[in-house]
Amino acid sequence: MSRFSQVFLSLKPSRFKNEIKGIVGYWPKDLSLYKLALRHSSAYPFRKKKGERNNERLEYLGDAVIDLVVAEALFYRFPKEDEGYLTKLRSKLVSRNNLNRVADELGLPNLLVANLKGNHGDSIYGDALEALVGAVY
């Protein structure tokens, strides 16, 4: 189990709730979606059954939400720009590097349950951010 998994699993529910409140700005009623959002598929590498619970589905939802919110903001912020400009700007704003940076600034690496010994690329924290956005949505 990774250091991050140990930190996450050792958090008391009240402390975890405080951490989530600090990130999302409100007191969550049900922590289960937030815990799921911070559970990477690598945390349980031998459990690959269909329907296994990890953050991938929330990541999918959060990715779409982030794209929509950023697209709408750019649409109204730059009313004279064409679709190509808006698409390029959105791509830069929601790039993996930016999502990883935001996730790091929010402290998500300290809450993520993951086995970091494997090769998961550099997207694991940005993916967790997307999953957290999916949980909020």
Briefly describe each language-model feature range.
Residues 2-137:
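RNase III-family endoribonuclease catalytic core
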